[in-house]
From Swiss-Prot:
This protein's encoding gene: Spc25
Family: Belongs to the SPC25 family.
Subcellular location: Nucleus; Chromosome, Centromere, Kinetochore
Protein name per the record: Kinetochore protein Spc25
The keyword Oxidoreductase appears for this protein: no
Function (record text): Acts as a component of the essential kinetochore-associated Ndc80 complex, which is required for chromosome segregation and spindle checkpoint activity during meiosis and mitosis. Required for kinetochore integrity and the organization of stable microtubule binding sites in the outer plate of the kinetochore. Participates in SAC signaling that responds specifically to disruptions in spindle microtubule dynamics. The NDC80 complex synergistically enhances the affinity of the SKA1 complex for microtubules and may allow the NDC80 complex to track depolymerizing microtubules.
One example of a Gene Ontology biological process annotation: meiotic spindle organization
Length: 222
């Protein structure tokens, strides 16, 4: 009887150990499953973190490129502003120079016209400005006690021989040739300047303030 009871107690202990082992194996399997799931989730998280890091790197690269591009645009705009300001200053300086040149040109023209007027009265020579520079047209008046002598001329502006002949003729009549030639030269300069920058007539291409005198015109007396 005692032996039967001892075996029964042993069987219970063995059964309890077996059941405990089964529970431990079940817990171990459950724990292993959880560990596997945790590792799997951890791997997914790591992969997601890597993908995110790659995206962040790409975004940082794009951001850096955009920032460099923006810096270049800012520098370009600043350079344009500086160039624009320099251009404005150059334009103002150019306008001032043009204004000064125009003022000096008007002053010079007024002085020349005054000289022409004075020389015209002194030499008694009157020039047709509309005929210049292609032709030299006018008249020299030699004043006398009883009557005046008129010497008209209408000629091309390149006749050197005609000029020499006229100068000799007027000089023989006591005309101040230095003043007379200065008058013609100034009148020619005014005519040339007034027609610039238009193309000068073909006849005046080689004009050098030289007068052509037509000595075939008769001398008039009044």
């Amino acid at each position: 009887m005692a032996i039967i009871m001892a075996e029964s107690s042993y069987e219970r202990r063995v059964k309890a150990l077996y059941e405990k082992q089964i529970r431990m194996e079940a817990l171990e399997a459950k724990f292993i499953k959880k560990v596997y799931k945790f590792n799997s989730n951890l791997l997914d998280v790591k992969e997601a973190a890597c993908r995110h890091q790659r995206k962040v790197g790409k975004l940082q690269k794009v951001l850096m490129e955009r920032r460099e591009e923006l810096d270049k645009r800012v520098s370009f705009i600043e350079e344009l502003d500086r160039e624009l300001e320099a251009t404005k200053l150059r334009d103002l300086a150019m306008k001032d120079r043009i204004k000064q040149q125009k003022m000096l040109a008007r002053q010079r023209k007024n002085e020349i016209m005054e000289s022409i007027h004075t020389l015209s009265k002194t030499t008694g020579t009157y020039i047709n400005q509309d005929a210049l520079p292609a032709r030299v047209k006018g008249v020299t008046v030699l004043r006398g006690d009883k009557r005046n002598q008129l010497i008209p001329f209408d000629l091309k502006s390149t006749d050197v021989e005609g000029l020499d002949s006229l100068c000799q003729h007027l000089e023989s009549l006591n005309v101040d040739m230095a003043q007379w030639q200065q008058l013609i030269s100034l009148a020619m300069d005014v005519a040339m300047e007034s027609r610039a920058p238009t193309t000068p007539p073909k006849e005046a291409t080689n004009c050098n303030s030289i007068i052509e005198i037509d000595l075939t015109s008769p001398t008039c007396h009044i």
